[in-house]
Swiss-Prot record:
EC assignment: 6.1.1.10
Name this protein carries in UniProt: Methionine--tRNA ligase
PROSITE patterns: AA_TRNA_LIGASE_I (PS00178)
Catalytic activity annotation: tRNA(Met) + L-methionine + ATP = L-methionyl-tRNA(Met) + AMP + diphosphate
Molecular function via GO: ATP binding; methionine-tRNA ligase activity
Enzyme class, spelled out: ligase
Binding site for ATP: K303
Function: Is required not only for elongation of protein synthesis but also for the initiation of all mRNA translation through initiator tRNA(fMet) aminoacylation.
Length: 515
């Protein structure tokens, strides 16, 4: 039986500097969504990569006295290494400087030409190098420093040059119909409202080529023009699936189930991209989800501003799964969030070390001592036993619904509510006291606790994969019994030998800090 396909992408990162925590946040969250759907039985394809063309790359390279290709090669290797360090399960890594991407970008350009949507004209307007975006005069403002800024707070400059244009104005009504008929196309709702309002205010045709630099994909048939970076960048999502060869087996993954992006690029993904696809007569992605910004104690991070936090250092300092857990649990996905040393330590020590780690250590140590290191044979389940087992089952359904809406924090919240309840159950049943008074009941309580840990261990795999693997290993859960379908279908069998219990989550102790 062929499994349902699920295609998910991050935005491709811009490698004019080193990776920062914002890149890591998007990759970790998207990785968790990809892992979740794999465990849910889907045939998943997960793409990330780097967006290597454009004037910013050229300017950054010139400052360093190297070519843009050298800059792209050097910095892309740091982004690839970040994906490895973060334990990202991406199926492909795309670079827009690859030959396959030149082919795909030129093919979508020609498809838009064939549809009558590209024409040559002259462009004069305000352009932000940092945003790689054009803005109308009404979207800009001159501040006290005498500099004109765009809506993202970045400086804009006046640009005049010959340009090809895309007839974006012809797609205004089609886009508004799309948003109305598919309210889930752009999420969360705040982003959707912004996009609808932007499109309703009137769309102007879009300049889609430049002649003032040559670091980009040449326009087919007019090589002195290179494609405006967003035509090139957005096309990466179909390049990776073999476009323009729609007989490629990977093409079956299109349309994408979700493009996960930062909210600052929602206009490109929710307005320009569907319009380009409509013009090229290609199916539209099912969802564009724009997450919020991460603030370091309240200040927005940006490579261009220079206040970025190195994700490699954070992993080194706190541990990978601790960082993954914190970012997905602490910040409602789609909203802006803030982080600090104290917040990371408090959240990971409380939830991971105390609640989950400690429960596993206490219950499995008791099984090792009192049950010959084997899963105990349970007796009849009491109401309390059934209640905690039922809550664990219900959490999976809650998590599935939450993940359908990219609400990672709600999925984790439901799973960790089970962990908190399991701690209350364990404390209330007092298996250490039952050892003398009712050893059979003690065995049942320890069985139920271990079984809840097994269910939780399976459910947390997308979020904290290495730690979940350790937990499932010490519960002797076979490698082929770790899918979501196994939460109900494959309970622990009494009499199974368990390995010696190992701590799963070390506590973060300030004394460990060597500054």
């Amino acid at each position: 039986m062929s499994r349902e396909k699920y295609y998910i992408t991050t935005a491709i990162a811009y490698p004019n500097g080193k990776p920062h925590i914002g890149h890591a946040y998007e990759l970790i969250a998207t990785d968790a969504m990809a892992r979740f759907q794999r465990l849910n039985g889907m045939d998943v394809y997960f793409l990330t990569g780097t967006d290597e063309h454009g004037i910013k790359m050229l300017q950054s390279a010139r400052k360093e006295g190297i070519t843009p290709r050298e800059l792209a090669d050097r910095n892309t290797s740091a982004f690839r290494r970040m994906a490895e360090v973060l334990n990202s399960s991406n199926d492909d890594y795309i670079r827009t400087s690859e030959e396959r991407h030149y082919k795909a970008s030129q093919a979508i350009w020609q498809a838009m030409v064939a549809n009558g949507d590209i024409y040559k004209g002259g462009y004069a307007g305000w352009y932000s190098v940092r945003d790689e975006a054009y803005y109308g005069e009404e979207e800009t403002e001159v501040r006290a420093d005498g500099v004109r800024y765009g809506p993202q707070g970045t400086p804009v400059e006046w640009v005049e040059e010959e340009s090809y244009f895309f007839r974006l104005s012809a797609y205004q009504d089609k886009l508004l119909d799309l948003y109305e008929n598919n309210p889930g196309f752009i999420m969360p709702a705040e982003r959707r409202n912004e996009i609808v309002s932007f499109v309703k205010s009137g769309l102007k045709d879009l300049s889609i080529s430049r002649t003032t630099f040559d670091w980009g994909i040449p326009v087919p048939g007019d090589e002195k023009h290179v494609m405006y970076v967003w035509v090139d960048a957005l096309t990466n999502y179909i390049t990776a699936l073999g476009y323009p060869d729609t007989t490629d087996e990977r093409w079956a993954y299109w349309p994408a189930n979700a493009h996960i992006i930062g909210k600052d690029i929602s206009r490109f993904h929710a307005v320009y991209w569907p319009a380009f696809l409509m013009s090229a007569q290609l199916p539209l992605p099912k969802r564009v989800f724009a997450h919020g910004f991460l603030f370091n104690r309240g200040e927005k991070m940006s490579k261009s501003v220079g206040n970025v936090i190195d994700p490699f250092e954070l992993v080194e300092r706190y541990g990978l799964d601790q960082l993954r857990y914190f970012l997905m649990r602490e910040v409602p996905f789609g909203q802006d969030g803030s982080y600090s040393h104290e917040a990371i330590v408090n959240r990971t020590n409380a939830d991971l070390a105390n609640d989950l780690g400690n429960l596993a250590q206490r219950s499995l140590s008791m099984i090792a001592k009192n049950c010959e290191g084997k899963v105990p044979q349970p007796g009849a389940f009491s109401e309390a036993d059934k209640a905690i087992l039922d809550q664990a089952d219900a959490a999976l359904e809650t998590a599935r619904k939450a993940m359908d809406d990219q609400a990672l924090h709600l999925a984790l919240g439901a799973i960790f509510a089970v962990v908190a309840e399991a701690n209350r159950y364990f404390a209330g049943q007092e298996p250490w006291a039952l050892r003398k008074t009712d050893p059979a009941r003690m065995g049942t309580v320890l069985y139920v606790t271990a079984e809840v840990l097994r269910r939780v261990g399976i459910m947390v795999q997308p979020f904290i994969p290495q730690s979940a693997e350790k937990l499932l290993d010490i519960l002797a859960v076979p490698a082929d019994k770790r899918q979501f379908a196994d939460v109900l279908a494959s309970p622990l069998a009494g009499g199974t030998d368990l390995p010696a219990p190992q701590p799963v989550f070390p506590r973060y102790v300030e004394a460990d800090e060597q500054n």
